[in-house]
Amino acid sequence: MAPYSLLVTRLQKALGVRQYHVASVLCQRAKVAMSHFEPNEYIHYDLLEKNINIVRKRLNRPLTLSEKIVYGHLDDPASQEIERGKSYLRLRPDRVAMQDATAQMAMLQFISSGLSKVAVPSTIHCDHLIEAQVGGEKDLRRAKDINQEVYNFLATAGAKYGVGFWKPGSGIIHQIILENYAYPGVLLIGTDSHTPNGGGLGGICIGVGGADAVDVMAGIPWELKCPKVIGVKLTGSLSGWSSPKDVILKVAGILTVKGGTGAIVEYHGPGVDSISCTGMATICNMGAEIGATTSVFPYNHRMKKYLSKTGREDIANLADEFKDHLVPDPGCHYDQLIEINLSELKPHINGPFTPDLAHPVAEVGKVAEKEGWPLDIRVGLIGSCTNSSYEDMGRSAAVAKQALAHGLKCKSQFTITPGSEQIRATIERDGYAQILRDLGGIVLANACGPCIGQWDRKDIKKGEKNTIVTSYNRNFTGRNDANPETHAFVTSPEIVTALAIAGTLKFNPETDYLTGTDGKKFRLEAPDADELPKGEFDPGQDTYQHPPKDSSGQHVDVSPTSQRLQLLEPFDKWDGKDLEDLQILIKVKGKCTTDHISAAGPWLKFRGHLDNISNNLLIGAINIENGKANSVRNAVTQEFGPVPDTARYYKKHGIRWVVIGDENYGEGSSREHAALEPRHLGGRAIITKSFARIHETNLKKQGLLPLTFADPADYNKIHPVDKLTIQGLKDFTPGKPLKCIIKHPNGTQETILLNHTFNETQIEWFRAGSALNRMKELQQ
């Protein structure tokens, strides 16, 4: 391999030199660091301003806030083609964040790139591998023991390549980012679909797969299809039991799980000022559930207040100077506009099984009775990256305190997940944690826990029909506890707390009464709590590891016999031929999320070992042939068996295969394992009615063909026993459909067209076998 300096020169020549943001204007102002942890990495609003002005002159129209931040980070603002929903933008993100479940594969890919240091500030956050069993400290100790090999790999890889490392117990990635790294106008990418949480602090924060993160860490311009912009105008003000969570629950009901695909959701209007900064983060966080690229709020005094309280008053002061670039222009155009009067917004609860099935809390009991959903609530769970702020915990404690005053405790089991060590320490100091314990709650570790399926649930048997209510973001079938009969509903933390006290979905805290131990009836008053502590936050324990200045002696070891970690082998290049006689591994019926494609929960321990985790490929998807999960016909033996076993059989016998999917295939998590696994086991194409954004990109990155039916009705022409030939790959060009020949067992054939969204760069990924392979080609 060529020397590192030569490789970098070649990469820069081929892909564009990273613009290090220095301008004479900045010299006249005090430099402000991006974070306390990176004192030599500065915020460069001057370059943002310069790029915005270039684009504004070109487009000659008012700009949305989303456009200002995105176009302000263009690699070449003077010549970049800009057309919403069509052109691919080459961007220069400010930083990268990775959680431990996705960081393993991202760092393994970065190691494979041959580069010696990350080109932008980057961090790893240990939050996904801690299973909830009995409570915080014990669960954390157990996780450190079980996951020692993975934590050691991530810590040493971070030290070797210049990546900050947040140790297990530090908190959930998105809360840590909000407290320390997000700021107005930042462009941040994260290997988690809820990265948009940072939009609550006025940043464009986008969830991506690990391969995208590798590009940015390598200093390569990052590609994003120019997003459309959906405006949500907020009027009135929140009050009573209505909360920020109800805004996004309402929006999800309007837009559905795919209504935001390819768009940034931009909140604006006079109602914004009635929402706290962390409340805005809640709304942006759950924007992932409508398929949005990200969501964002304009910079205002609530953000300034939060920045100051988290020790970043210097950033707030700098943002004040550039505020015109951190809010939308008057008269800017939105591709779609939704208006919500916050004064009329009622508390909502969404579910079960999908986050866009919205109900007012006042009506969900009647709907549940009609649908036959279990009314009794077995467990109420508050916290998660969506709702674990100081204000969230305070409002829940305010509800709990009223019940305790009347001698009541929860009828349901009740758990609390602090979002970070800082939140945990502060709610302990200020008494909120004890109030919630007194109600019957168990405080879990500062981690994702049950929200992502890390829950060793003991109170039910698998297959037992039951209801849980959470303040989380997703409620897909089996997501929280691997039980397909758990009816999970998402709502605000204070509503979860009230429902856990009552123990039933039929309870409406706005109108219904509870009976105290003295026999007297009382009604819960709407909770009120401070959005931020009156004093300073308590930082708690120090859980951050700085990368050393000199990492030349740092080693990163991956044992060849490890069951948790595995160095990556490059995928084969395209052989230059059309794809002939592809076997159909599975024709999926209905919803197929990344949880269905690559389950989390007990499988998280294999996130760094591609071959082992591939044993969960599509085990949650429903086979249209028999209506069952993880049961497909082997076309050779004609026997039904698990999906991964069948895929391995095909791979062993040189049979290439394809998956047929329905609408919004791959919605949910950003996990790129859902793309790596089919590629590893011999898949060549995924053909669907439509894709979720992140998953479609992840498939392209790994050399697969994500294709969509030109006519969605053609989905019905394909049967699981057919074979498919995909033609036109020799002339594979942007915008030109590919031809698919369907070969039926009776000898008849049909020809259909398949669309794609590949651009020239992405076609090169396919030809090279993967984006990582293409990166290596450019180094030679």
Swiss-Prot record:
Enzyme class label: lyase
Phosphoserine modifications at = 559, 670
Instruction: List residues, modification N6-succinyllysine.
Output: 31, 50, 138, 144, 233, 411, 549, 573, 577, 591, 605, 628, 689, 723, 730
Where along the chain is substrate bound?
Answer: 99, 192-194, 474, 479, 607, 670-671
| Residues where [4Fe-4S] cluster binds | 385, 448, 451
* Gene3D superfamilies xrefs: Aconitase, Domain 2, Aconitase, domain 3, Aconitase, domain 4
InterPro entries, sorted: Acnase/IPM_dHydase_lsu_aba_1/3, Acoase/IPM_deHydtase_lsu_aba, Aconitase/3IPM_dehydase_swvl, Aconitase/IPM_isomerase, Aconitase_4Fe-4S_BS, Aconitase_4Fe-4S_dom, Aconitase_dom2, Aconitase_mito-like
Record's superkingdom? Eukaryota
- Compositional bias (Polar residues) at which positions? 551-560
Q: At which residues is N6-acetyllysine found?
A: 50, 138, 144, 233, 573, 605, 723, 730, 736, 739, 743
Associated condition reads: Infantile cerebellar-retinal degeneration: A severe autosomal recessive neurodegenerative disorder characterized by onset between ages 2 and 6 months of truncal hypotonia, athetosis, seizures, and ophthalmologic abnormalities, particularly optic atrophy and retinal degeneration. Affected individuals show profound psychomotor retardation, with only some achieving rolling, sitting, or recognition of family. Brain MRI shows progressive cerebral and cerebellar degeneration.
Q: Name the family the entry cites.
A: Belongs to the aconitase/IPM isomerase family.
Subunit structure, per the record?
Monomer.
What PANTHER family does this protein map onto?
A: ACONITATE HYDRATASE B (PTHR43160), ACONITATE HYDRATASE, MITOCHONDRIAL (PTHR43160:SF3)
Q: What is this protein called?
A: Aconitate hydratase, mitochondrial
Q: Which organism is it from?
A: Homo sapiens (Human)
Q: Which gene encodes it?
A: ACO2
